[in-house]
UniProtKB/Swiss-Prot annotation:
Residues 1-13, 444-454 have a biased composition (Acidic residues). Present with 149 molecules/cell in log phase SD medium. Interacts with UBC9 and CDC3. Zn(2+) binds at residues 377, 379, 400, 403. One of its GO terms (molecular function) is SUMO transferase activity. This is E3 SUMO-protein ligase SIZ1. It is found in: Cytoplasm; Nucleus; Bud neck. It comes from Saccharomyces cerevisiae (strain ATCC 204508 / S288c) (Baker's yeast). One of its GO terms (cellular component) is chromatin. Its main location: cytoplasm. Residues 501-511 have a biased composition (Basic and acidic residues). The modification Phosphoserine is found at residues 132, 794. Residues 34-68 form the SAP domain. GO terms for biological process: chromosome segregation; DNA double-strand break attachment to nuclear envelope; negative regulation of protein ubiquitination; protein sumoylation.
Length: 904
């Protein structure tokens, strides 16, 4: 702290030794004015007061501040000291020479006028008390301005806006705006000057002016670089000190000749100097007319002043040429900074051998062309000089985009090290790795992902085109389009007709969707001995097959001929040229089948065999057609008594395919002809090529296991053929013992039951005496084809089984055949009631004997242990009387038992 008593002793007391409030306020005001002075101006005051001039700005300010505050000391209050310092500050602002402080203080204490003191001090000879001339030494700028000033009168205010007007009072001078490298101020328009006053509401200021002919021609020339700009600055009550930023009152609305100016004249908030002047050039009128400029503002708290100047524009490209002429940042300086940075990392415990530098401009995010930065920047990253200049033309922040320090155009330089890297690396390089010795390595982007994406994109159209071409070549305009979806997994099995496509569930579903329509033109009765082989071969071949009628006349060659479709299928898979011929054959078969569905073929009256027909209403179900209930289906209402049904079953709530059979071959499941079974997936209509249309004998199907725990699996049993009755063979499917499996009895409950109104007759002594000694069938359904044919006329007809149900052959597994020596449990109830109710049945076929059957106890679920009741079901398992849906498809009302067992 500098002791003022060492430099100044005030022994002469003032007129008033007690400080007043006015004196305190005057001291504070003088200190505020002093803090706005520059360092050179502070030194001038220190010279006048005989204070040392060495030190920083803060030291000089503290010295003068303490000198003023000592004037308020009790007993030593000095109002003349404050007036003297204030007079010196006023002389500095007027760029006038300063007198010696002691002379000034004595004149103030004696009451000498200030003008006389100034003249005497400036003209009088040096005195003994003065250690320096009366005119304090000034800076070169002040001496240059002072030399033009008269000693007897003040200089008139210049026309140049850079000059300041001088007066004895605190007059507001003209504003000297901060210079911009993008334009040079040429001339002021005297009439285009407006003042913005402080207002609490809406205010408006306007100016009217005319341009001279020379000025108008200069501004209206399209190739001219001159513009008419409107500047605005805030008035400082302490006076303008130069380099004032451009600031417009906000909010505002600027209009020139009733056209609103939409230039960005606001800039960034809380960042003075980022606003641009308003360009009035495009809206000027000819020199013979008067121009009107209006500024509407509101709620201004400070005064503003607006000036119109004619300026000369400088483009960023012209500034870039100047930057390129500046000295470059040499490579050695960059390498030194790089080594220093890596060394600092090592001192901090970080082992850094290299660093990565981006070659992209942080302003445009494009590859740099003119890598530059300020000479004061302490970083390695550069930016593009041209992009930087264009960005400053829009919003003049003049800050480094990397480190945010202020940048002057004179300090902008090109980096020689980065420019050398840009010249020697490829254009697609965005980053380089730098080492401490200055070596760099280009970092290339990994283009494998983009290449793979482009390759996939190029392959996809080709693949789609090939599929489209194949589709067009294999289709005909007059024939239906059939798409073959056989996968490659079917090819190995196509070579062997005895191997079924039973690999996995996906293959099984694929076979379900690839079944095609089959036209049956032969009789199955004449080829009974070879049914198994024929059916097995037909299952392996999922394409369209047309069996010739000669197949029925040659019993011994039937098996060999049935192998032909399987071999043809193998050839189709191996030879792509045969696909078109097969598709045409399939289309012709389908077309012929559609034409023949509504025609009935009558046989001769003297023939003992029934007539052939392709009418689906005649319910020509062959043994190979299999129906598996998958989901709950909507079926017509059945009016029969539900208590007379055999093999009552729970509904398939989960909608899954039952697992009680295997997909080895085509085991039969008979359903009622009045039930319309819909498949969950679309399938092509088909029928077995080796089975008869109307001569199928009645079938016996074990629908469930014995409730007492018998493990006899469900199997469709066909009695031997008799010439005088309608009989059926044991099974039309070829069963392989190693592929047969016995599933848990839970899934066997998913089989379908059939109405008891269907009348069945048997005339086989082996069936009545040996296989079924007690003439009682537990869980069996006996159907006759004749009865099925007549029921189509008595019940609402819906197609019994769609022809595409043959596609379920591969998805429905088959249990092994029923042993012939297994005894059938008889009903303990000797009421003599038949197993099947025949009250509403159709007339029986002639020459047939009815098997006396007793009414069986109702089987609800084979997994529930037997109850002591015999005729009444538990309430939880009682049938719904209000259900309008037939129980054939398993739509029983289930509660706890159904949920428990079906969930397994």
């Amino acid at each position: 702290m500098i002791n003022l008593e060492d430099y100044w002793e005030d022994e002469t007391p003032g007129p008033d030794r007690e400080p007043t409030n006015e004196l305190r306020n005057e001291v504070e005001e003088t200190i505020t004015l002093m803090e706005l002075l520059k360092v050179s101006e502070l030194k001038d005051i220190c010279r006048s007061v005989s204070f040392p001039v060495s030190g920083r700005k803060a030291v000089l300010q503290d010295l003068i501040r303490n000198f003023l505050q000592n004037a308020l000391v009790v007993g030593k209050s000095d109002p003349y000291r404050v007036q003297a310092v204030k007079f010196l500050i006023e002389r500095i602002r007027k760029n006038e020479p300063l007198p010696v402080y002691k002379d000034l203080w004595n004149a103030l204490r004696k009451g000498t006028p200030l003008s006389a003191i100034t003249v005497r001090s400036m003209e009088g000879p040096p005195t003994v008390q003065q250690q320096s001339p009366s005119v304090i030494r000034q800076s070169p700028t002040q001496r240059r301005k002072t030399s033009t000033t008269s000693s007897t009168s003040r200089a008139p205010p210049p026309t140049n806006p850079d000059a300041s007007s001088s007066s004895s009072s605190f007059a507001v001078p003209t504003i000297h705006f901060k210079e911009s490298p993008f334009y040079k101020i040429q001339r002021l328009i005297p009439e285009l000057v407006m003042n913005v006053e402080v207002t609490g509401g809406r205010g408006m200021c306007s100016a009217k002016f005319k341009l001279s002919k020379a000025d108008y021609n200069l501004l209206s020339n399209p190739n001219s670089k001159h513009r008419l700009y409107l500047f605005s600055g805030m008035i400082n009550p302490l006076g303008s000190r130069g380099n004032e930023p451009i600031q417009f009152p906000f909010p505002n609305e600027l209009r020139c000749n009733n056209v609103q100016i939409k230039d960005n004249i606001r800039g960034f908030k809380s960042k003075p100097g980022t606003a641009k002047p308003a360009d009035l050039t495009p809206h000027l009128k000819p020199y013979t007319q008067q121009n009107n400029v209006e500024l509407i503002y509101a709620f201004t708290t400070k005064e503003y002043k607006l000036f119109g100047y004619i300026v000369e524009m400088i483009t960023p490209e012209q500034l870039l040429e100047k930057v390129l002429q500046h000295p470059k940042i040499i490579k050695q300086a960059t390498l030194l900074y790089l080594k220093k940075t890596l060394r600092e990392d090592e001192e901090m415990g970080l082992t850094t051998t290299s660093t990565i530098m981006s070659l992209q401009c942080p302003i445009s995010y494009t590859r740099m062309k003119y890598p530059s930065k300020s000479i004061n920047c302490k970083h390695l990253q550069c930016f593009d000089a041209l992009w930087f200049l264009h960005s400053q033309l829009q919003i003049p922040t003049w800050q480094c985009p990397v480190c945010q320090i202020d940048i002057a155009l004179e300090n902008l330089a090109i980096s020689e090290f980065v420019d050398d890297i840009l010249q020697n690396c490829q254009k697609n390089v965005e980053q380089v790795e730098l080492t401490s010795d200055g070596k760099w390595t280009a970092i290339l982007e990994d283009d494998d992902d983009s290449d793979s994406d482009s390759n996939d994109g190029s392959r996809s159209p080709e693949k789609g085109t090939s599929v489209s071409d194949h589709h067009c070549s294999s289709s005909h305009p007059s024939e239906p389009i059939i798409i073959n979806l056989d996968s490659d997994d079917d090819e190995p099995n196509g070579n062997n007709p005895h191997v079924t496509n039973n690999h996995d569930d996906s293959n099984r579903h694929s076979n379900d969707n690839n079944n095609n329509s089959i036209k049956n033109n032969d009789s199955h009765n004449k080829n009974n001995n070879n049914n198994n082989n024929n059916n097995n071969n037909n299952n392996d071949n999922n394409n369209s097959i047309e069996n010739n009628d000669s197949n029925s006349n040659n019993k011994h060659d039937h098996g060999s001929r049935s192998n032909t479709p399987s071999h043809n299928h193998t050839k189709n898979l191996m030879n792509d040229n045969d696909d078109d011929d097969d598709d045409r054959l399939m289309a012709e078969i389908t077309s012929n089948h559609l034409k023949s569905t509504n025609t009935d073929i009558l046989t001769e009256k003297g023939s003992s065999a029934p007539s052939r027909t392709l009418d689906p209403k005649s319910y020509n179900i062959v043994a190979s057609e299999t129906t598996t209930p998958v989901t709950n289906r909507v079926i017509p209402e059945y009016l029969g008594n539900s208590s007379s049904y055999i093999g009552k079953q729970l509904p398939n709530i989960l909608g899954k395919t039952p697992l009680n059979v295997t997909a080895v071959d085509n085991s039969s499941h008979l359903i009622s002809p009045d039930v319309s079974v819909s498949s969950p997936t679309p399938r092509n209509t088909a029928s077995n090529a080796s089975s008869s249309a109307l001569s199928t004998p009645p079938l016996i199907r074990m629908s469930s296991l014995d409730p007492r725990g018998s493990t006899v699996p469900d199997k469709t049993i066909r009695p031997p053929i008799n010439s005088n009755s309608y009989t059926a063979s044991i099974s039309d499917s070829f069963v392989q013992p190693q592929e047969s499996s016995v599933f848990p009895p839970r899934e066997q409950n998913m089989d379908m039951s059939f109405p008891s109104t269907v009348n069945s007759r048997f005339n086989d002594p082996r069936l009545n005496t040996t296989r079924f000694p007690d003439s009682t069938l537990r869980g069996a359904t006996i159907l006759s084809n004749n009865g099925l044919d007549q029921r189509n006329n008595s019940l609402p007809t819906t197609e019994a089984i769609t022809r595409n149900d043959v596609g379920r052959q591969n998805s429905t597994p088959v249990l092994p055949t029923l042993p012939q020596n297994v005894p059938i449990r008889t009903n303990s109830n000797k009421s003599g009631l038949p197993l099947i109710n025949n009250e509403n049945s159709v007339p029986n076929p002639p020459n047939t004997a009815t098997i006396p059957l007793q009414k069986s106890r109702l089987i609800v679920n084979p997994f529930i242990p037997r109850r002591p009741y015999s005729n009444v079901l538990p309430q939880k398992r009682q049938l719904s009387n209000t259900s309008s849906t037939s129980p054939i498809m398993g739509t029983w009302k289930t509660q706890d038992y159904g949920k428990k067992y079906n969930s397994g």
